[in-house]
Amino acid sequence: MAGGVTGGADGTWSDRFEQGLHPFIEVFNASIGFDLTLLQEDLDGSIAHARMLGSCGVISVEEAEQLVQGLETIRSEAHAGTFQPGLADEDVHFAVERRLIALLGPVGKKLHTGRSRNDQVGTDLRLWLRRRLDELEGDLQRLQRALVAQADLHRRTMIPGYTHLQRAQPLCLAHHLLAYVEMLERDRLRLHDVRSRVNICPLGAAALAGTPVPIDRQQTAKALGFDAIYANSLDAVSDRDFCVEFSAAASLVMAHLSRLAEEVIAWASEEFRFVRLSDRCATGSSLMPQKKNPDVPELVRGKCGRVFGHLQGLLTMIKGLPLAYNKDFQEDKEALFDAFRTTRDCIEAMAILFEEGLEFRTERLNTAVEQDFSNATDVADYLVAKGVPFREAYQLVGAVVRRCLDEGCLLRDLSLAAWQELHPAFEADLHDALAPQAVVAARRSEGGTGFDRVDEQLGRWLQHLNGTQPVG
């Protein structure tokens, strides 16, 4: 045919077409450059489909076994690097079918009986994403373990707590790190929840309306490990909600990683000096020899936008599509693949950073909490414990802070006599109550930063990540 190959396993769509594709359109239309990622899943789905055709009597059992052996041969060729699809194949499905026909002859042409690429690609995508979701859950737990290990080292290390990036109240460093462990646990559970909707099988929906071929959809779904089949064939081939859901869940993972990355970047700066970056996770400057740049967290923070962009792209792709399948769906794959790879890589990078790439400057951190007014709330709490109404105590302490700022001193610098001039409820135990260790230890409410509560939280997480008990 003139003008290039029109596609299909034998180089043609059908006798419906008299001319080949324009050479540019052939390239523009092809997805083989990226959907070959789905090869293993395509082979798995085709093997299950072939066996089902044989058991239902659509083809002979012998033919089904030939198809299975041919598909396994293609798998072996792929592992050996000898399976080389070309542009003429258009996509992974045609590439497999073309090679199968080359291996088996006419029997290879029977594989696609009772099936369309529409339900085939939906099945492949779900199989691929199901595996990737399982991997991401493990990756998140690795990062959680790294954070918990750091928290375990710093059960009694303190760090300034901030609101509005202003010093607020002192915290236990372990408590701060465990906040991210909690975020990541929500992410892990969210991804696990997405998996339940990924794990529904569209195979057998055919192009959009089902098939007159006497197939057994339940058999293929069970063989492939799906929990259920789509109840509506039109919905089965039209659904890309699971791609959007994954991208949304991945976006939240990235948002949490970006927040953690931003804190590491700040902590590593000369202005904070809370962490020291190792040479294995930092780079230098081509001009300024003194620099040690936090490239790892900066890249994580920067890559966050890629995953957010894929979510927006997928939402935009599906919003105006009529039922059922549309070529627009070809755009789901690169977005999905890159969202996964970016999220996975960023999780691993942050895990390495906390496993071996940074060291908390304990002395600096414990000193930092002594050099501010973050114990002001505790003065108010002290008065409340003595029977003073909170709002009265709050206003009094605010006036004291103003006085200290004017005089260039801290609350700890005021004498007991000066305190008692302000209110007779102040007693000799005040200064002990204002010490950072006492301030942190006093936060004993459940989930608080008090050392005893943090020990409880850490114990629960250590057991959970070792698989001995759930978090709760």
UniProtKB/Swiss-Prot annotation:
It is an enzyme of class 4 (lyase). Its EC number is 4.3.2.1. It catalyses: 2-(N(omega)-L-arginino)succinate = fumarate + L-arginine. PROSITE patterns: FUMARATE_LYASES. It holds the Pfam family Lyase_1. It is found in: Cytoplasm. Coiled coil: none annotated. One of its GO terms (biological process) is arginine biosynthetic process via ornithine. Keywords: Amino-acid biosynthesis, Arginine biosynthesis, Cytoplasm, Lyase. Pathway: Amino-acid biosynthesis; L-arginine biosynthesis; L-arginine from L-ornithine and carbamoyl phosphate: step 3/3. The keyword Transmembrane does not apply. It comes from the Bacteria. One of its GO terms (cellular component) is cytosol. InterPro entries: Arg_succ_lyase_C (IPR029419), Argininosuccinate_lyase (IPR009049), Fumarase/histidase_N (IPR024083), Fumarate_lyase_CS (IPR020557), Fumarate_lyase_fam (IPR000362), Fumarate_lyase_N (IPR022761), L-Aspartase-like (IPR008948). One of its GO terms (molecular function) is argininosuccinate lyase activity. NCBIfam families: argH. Belongs to the lyase 1 family. Argininosuccinate lyase subfamily. This is Argininosuccinate lyase.
